[in-house]
């Protein structure tokens, strides 16, 4: 069984359904976490927009 670690960006805009965008796919957890750590610096939350990131694990 092979695991894939997929990093998603979640964007929530006021009045619009939140949506997720795949921004990276990795074979190893360490690589996904390094990428996520860098992207977390771009996380923000204000009155109109909330931007966050998360990792989803998928089995092949």
Region spans (language model):
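Sequence-level detector for tyrosine residue identity
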Residues: 5-8, 28, 44
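Short, mixed-charge low-complexity intrinsically disordered segments
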Residues: 33, 37-60
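A short, exposed loop/beta-hairpin motif centered on an aromatic-Gly-Thr core
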Residues: 17-30, 34, 54
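Short aromatic-glycine-(Arg/Gly/Cys) micro-motifs in beta-strand/loop hairpins
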Residues: 1-22, 49-50
